[in-house]
């Protein structure tokens, strides 16, 4: 028996990956060679047997003993002549041949399956056309040695045709590779390589992917999409000629790296690069799997040219080649993590300069890859040819990509090459990756211009009250008011505020528990021409004091029991308000103006000191008029006020019903945290319209049974969610339980509540493929932009930074002009306009919605 050898180079990773996977044939590699011409099939079959016998790794056996895996060459193993199959009389010879190959590949072909790890077949599909099918286990060969074996078999066939002796084996015994590898592991070179890769790992940027799905640490799929791109129109050749000082391989790599970076919207990312790991060693002519995929940190500068990027990447690879023997799995282990635990890189790049040509007299040979092993994400094989053209083969994990998306990405690469061919001095940051028609598509999505009246919240409410004075308007557990009665209370309180010194343009703080008096106070403040500043009484005293110090309101409305909390705030007029006032008429004061600030709401402070966001009257008027148009309320509707007033969602609860003749009912303080209390509240008041933060909707759904959903939620006609990502499965559960339409809204505090919408029920919900419902489409007079790091629009499917524009922008941050200038920036696509940088990452979906 031959010497027992340990697994080396790529073998341990392949062995472990197969053991951990439930995929039966993922680690098989296969291709077929299409032979056109006169072929002596029996002679070729003899050449196959002779050629296979010359590669000792093809006779390897494997065993595992006490956790250690060993391999040895089975000297007694012989190879049978490959089967010769004649399909010339078949209706579809090509399809039948491909089906035979796929059937072979779909078997359990794991190393311990008992099936042959080496398999050849000769299939005749026409008089002078053959398919030579070849399949190996990846433990035996790699992408370098596979075509080398095919080439040697072709050489043997040609020798047999000429009546010459079988050519000697060009292949090194794999035992030499193992010995050399073990010597390397004990050498100073290994220590130097370890130090080099430790430093590279520290500097390595995070991996990127063209897929929106999270990048897995280890692939769970061998289902691969293949796309072959042929750049034979001369544009790559033209570019290479213009940049004669740059190697074509370096140019191809730079184009691929830039294309990936721009489509990932990542100027710094980690890709994989395939190294032969054969230079100057026994492995140079061995057939075992020694290829190494190592992490390549790609850094793209917007202001550099393509030649500069190509030269820099080439220098980087030159340095890496000196250390290419070090295992990628060892790099991960050196960083304290298990191989496969998390991805080291995303897409894999491979410059293929292997000789795939077979020199058989009178026969044309073309190789067609069938299986190359699992693809974690995306692999790009770059083939610069001797004519100066370029072809690229894209392999994509089918669980992460679909063919139309890949084809679209490929079109962008062609467009990128064309731009550089037209202008080789073009900067990397100035390349356009938008396809023709996509600018018009985005313009159509943002065509939201609607003329709205130049008015204010108080004017809209007064107008509605005049139409329906006797309709029920506002209620809580103790009080209820008609529209006329509500207006009388609002005007009375507004006049009282004016007597206490409140002037138009001022701000008034409100620290009231949830009740009718909270709603009346907010309406009175805008009636007086001022802006309201909500203070959540559940906040700590220090936070409330900080908000008052920053906002410096002219007055505080609170209750007797809350008053002591504000005793040490200087220069603050206080008004205790917890009972109806004597009516003084309901005529509008008409003090509020469209340019006034409507409200000031402080951010959560999760990213530092809370900031007061000022939102203008015109912005919130647009938002409410859009909502009434899109989700119309009538006099039959009952809206729940359950959102804490410190969150801007409460704004539409406090005002929307009163521009539509609907009724607002106030939940008890803290009831919004109690799902059972909310069930009772909905049932008692016949609530038709309400809002949930998704996490609270989940708690509410968990409290429901089919029976209680029928009893307590039957009046609900429309339910809104915002504030967090809305899980699609939660929407499906809600739909099944209640049937009430659910709507997803999105908007930061720096907007007038929400800037986008998406149905989270029915057909739209059924079409959601991600884990969360999209944030959707822009509301009236609002634009959504998704931009890359260079402030260029990104195409559909590409992630970028989310911005919004136009009428619903907040006025800015209270007393923070520096911060306002950094977040509310000039809109480069609309001179004189501003846009807000949300900090969220988003992408356009094919239906025009934002996700």
Predicted regions and their residues:
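Non-catalytic, low-complexity flexible loops and terminal extensions
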Residues: 10, 153-224, 297, 428-431
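His-Asp-centered acyl/peptidyl-transfer active-site segments
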Residues: 3, 21-28, 56-57, 113, ...
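Conserved AMP-binding/adenylation subdomain of ANL enzymes
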Residues: 611-640, 648-688
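Gly/Ser/Thr-rich phosphate-binding loop
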Residues: 659-662, 687-691, 701-770, 774, ...
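AMP-dependent adenylate-forming
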Residues: 327, 341, 350, 358, ...
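A short, small/polar-residue-rich loop/turn motif at beta-strand boundaries
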Residues: 1-3, 37-53, 72-114, 194, ...
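Flexible, P/S/T/G-rich "lid" or insertion loops adjacent to the active sites of thioester-utilizing
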Residues: 17-26, 190-246, 336, 434-439, ...
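Carrier-protein-dependent adenylate-forming modules in NRPS/ANL systems
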Residues: 1-171, 263, 294-295, 324, ...
């Amino acid at each position: 028996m031959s010497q027992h050898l340990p697994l080396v180079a790529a073998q341990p990773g392949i062995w472990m990956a197969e053991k951990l996977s439930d995929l039966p044939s993922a680690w098989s590699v296969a291709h077929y060679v299409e032979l056109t011409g006169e072929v002596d099939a029996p002679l070729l079959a003899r050449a196959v047997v002779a050629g296979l016998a010359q590669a000792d790794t093809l006779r390897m056996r494997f065993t595992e003993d006490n956790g250690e895996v060993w391999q040895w060459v089975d000297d007694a193993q012989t190879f049978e002549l490959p089967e010769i199959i004649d399909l010339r009389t078949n209706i579809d010879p090509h399809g039948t041949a491909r089906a035979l190959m796929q059937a072979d590949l779909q078997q359990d072909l794991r190393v311990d399956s008992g099936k042959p790890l080496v398999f050849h077949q000769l299939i005749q599909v026409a008089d002078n056309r053959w398919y030579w099918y070849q399949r190996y286990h990846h433990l035996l060969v790699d992408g370098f040695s596979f075509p080398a074996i095919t080439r040697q078999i072709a050489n043997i066939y040609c020798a047999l045709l000429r009546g010459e002796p079988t050519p000697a084996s060009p292949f090194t015994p794999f035992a030499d590779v193992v010995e050399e590898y073990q010597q390397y592991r004990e050498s100073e070179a290994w220590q130097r390589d370890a130090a080099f890769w430790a430093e590279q790992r520290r500097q390595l940027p995070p991996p990127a992917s063209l897929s929106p799905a999270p990048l897995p640490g280890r692939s769970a799929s061998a289902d691969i999409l293949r796309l072959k791109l042929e750049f034979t129109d001369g544009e790559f050749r033209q570019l290479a000629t213009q940049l004669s000082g740059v190697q074509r391989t370096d140019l191809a790599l730079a184009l691929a790296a830039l294309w990936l970076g721009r489509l990932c919207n990542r100027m710094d990312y980690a890709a994989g690069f395939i190294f032969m790991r054969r230079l100057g060693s026994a492995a140079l002519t061995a057939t075992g799997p020694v290829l190494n995929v190592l992490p390549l940190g790609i850094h793209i500068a917007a202001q550099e040219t393509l030649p500069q990027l190509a030269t820099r990447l080439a220098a980087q690879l030159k340095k890496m080649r000196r250390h290419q023997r070090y295992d990628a799995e060892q790099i991960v282990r050196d960083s304290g993590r298990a191989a496969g635990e998390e991805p080291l890189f995303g897409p894999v790049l491979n410059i293929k300069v292997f000789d795939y040509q077979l020199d058989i007299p009178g026969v044309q040979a073309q190789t067609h890859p069938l299986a190359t092993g699992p693809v974690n994400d995306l692999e790009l094989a770059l083939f610069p040819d001797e004519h100066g053209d370029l072809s690229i083969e894209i392999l994509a994990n089918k669980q992460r990509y679909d063919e139309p998306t890949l084809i679209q990405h490929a079109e962008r690469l062609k467009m990128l090459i064309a731009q550089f061919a037209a202008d080789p001095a073009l900067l990397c940051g100035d390349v356009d990756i938008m396809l023709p028609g996509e600018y018009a598509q985005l313009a159509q999505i943002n065509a939201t211009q609607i003329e709205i009246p130049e008015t204010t919240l108080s004017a809209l409410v007064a107008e509605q009250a005049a139409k329906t004075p006797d309709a029920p308007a506002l209620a809580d557990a103790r009080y209820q008011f008609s529209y006329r009665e509500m207006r009388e209370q609002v005007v009375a309180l507004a006049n009282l505020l004016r007597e206490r010194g409140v002037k138009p343009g001022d701000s008034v703080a409100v620290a009231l528990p949830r009740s009718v008096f909270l709603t009346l106070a907010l309406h009175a403040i805008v009636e007086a021409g001022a802006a309201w500043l909500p203070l959540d009484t559940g906040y700590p005293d220090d936070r409330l004091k900080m908000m008052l110090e920053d906002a410096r309101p002219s007055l505080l409305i609170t209750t007797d029991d809350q008053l002591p909390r504000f005793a040490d705030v200087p220069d603050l007029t206080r008004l205790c308000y917890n009972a109806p006032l004597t009516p003084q008429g309901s005529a509008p004061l008409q003090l509020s103006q469209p340019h006034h600030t409507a409200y000031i709401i402080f951010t959560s402070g999760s990213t530092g000191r809370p900031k007061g966001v000022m939102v203008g009257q015109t912005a919130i008027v647009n938002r409410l008029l859009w909502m009434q148009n899109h989700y119309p309320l009538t006099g039959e509707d009952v809206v729940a006020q359950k959102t804490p007033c410190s969150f801007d969602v409460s704004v539409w609860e406090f005002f929307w019903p009163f521009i539509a003749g609907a009724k607002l009912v106030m939940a008890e303080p803290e009831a919004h945290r109690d799902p059972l209390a909310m069930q009772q509240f909905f049932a008692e008041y016949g609530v038709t319209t309400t809002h949930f933060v998704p996490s609270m909707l989940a708690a509410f759904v968990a409290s429901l049974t089919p029976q209680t959903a029928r009893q307590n939620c039957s009046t609900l006609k429309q339910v809104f969610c915002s504030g967090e990502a809305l899980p699609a499965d939660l929407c499906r559960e809600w739909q099944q339980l209640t049937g009430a339409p659910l709507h997803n809204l999105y908007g930061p505090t720096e907007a007038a509540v929400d800037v986008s919408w998406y149905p989270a029920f029915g057909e739209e919900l059924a079409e959601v493929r991600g884990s969360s419902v999209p944030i959707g489409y822009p509301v009236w007079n609002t634009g959504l932009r998704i931009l890359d790091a260079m402030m260029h629009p990104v195409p559909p499917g590409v992630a970028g930074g989310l911005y919004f524009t136009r009428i619903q922008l907040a006025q800015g941050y209270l007393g923070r002009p520096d911060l306002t200038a950094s977040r509310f920036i000039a809109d480069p696509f609309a001179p004189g306009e501003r846009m807000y940088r949300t900090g969220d990452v988003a992408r356009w979906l094919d239906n025009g919605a934002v996700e």
